[in-house]
Amino acid sequence: NFYLEVAKMRAARLLWCRIMKGFDAKNPKSLMLRTHCQTSGWSLTEQDPYNNVVRTTIEAMAAVFGGTQSLHTNSFDEAIALPTEFSSRIARNTQLYLQRDCGLCSWVDPFGGSLLLEQRTQALVRQALDRIQEIEEAGGMTKALENSLPKRRIEEAAARKQARIDSGIDPIIGVNAYRPLVDLITPEIPLLKVDHEQVLKAQLDSLQTLRAGRDEVAVQNALRALREVARVMASDNPTKDQETKDQETNAEKTAGFGLMECAVEAARHRATLGEISGALEDIFGRYTAQPFSIQGVYAQQMAQDIHFEKALAAVRAFADEHGRRPRILVAKLGQDGHDRGAKIIA
């Protein structure tokens, strides 16, 4: 939604300014929201992929009109593979075209005063404050993350959106609307091919060269210092007396500022990212996500869909025969974090 995306940026600036004033910010520049935007990944389609050039252009325009300071435009083939130099150049030139040829960056907040945009902006501010209040009532963001509240809200919204797409309520050009005829299907586009074994070998060779040329004693000392700072932050013994607690509270404050500094110092001595992460894992442990599944959100949007009703009937028949619903393994490979598709299927 082009206008909604512009309004999001405007609402974010208003919220940031209001919140910073609440913290009694002394420097006026602290009231300025600095943002980096990236065009959508999940809006890109494998079907009729050249349409993605237009999608990315319009999404980039929304970010520019919204006042972003930094922008990344996705390549049109990223729904299929890593981008090629050809597709990356189109993505880069999209920004140059909007900036240089169209002059979109010449005016600050060009939609300011528009009745539509002002109303949408204020509505988003109110809705965002409701979400912030919900998080505060949950005990703050850390507690909300532990309870998967933001994650749940995101996945509920994604399921609702996907149901609207699958039911045809929300059109996706080239996918569920205005699909090309068989003889007009876009020809196969060139894709980037990656030799994973070669990439692995190159990385292992690079690490071997790195370790051979560094001061191992200095590296281990830096990692040891990182663990010590992390250990102070992690310590929490309720049996300690108040004086000891006060001393450790001061140490924790220092450690809070020093953790990043120690990590940077370790990197300066050529400790690897894995070694730095491993040192922190030694103290904090490894995070384990709490699995949960949302139910009923998708079905609400698909209640009148005949294909969905047939699927439900098939599941009921299976459950009657086997005493349980069917189980399907959804395996999301890789570590890029793009799990929307897997979550939607689940």
PLM features: residue spans?
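Glycine-rich phosphate/diphosphate-binding loop of Rossmann-like nucleotide-binding domains
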Residues: K332-I344
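Flexible, glycine-rich loop/tail regions that form catalytic "lids" or insertion modules at the edges
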Residues: E85, N93-L96, R100-A234, E252-E309
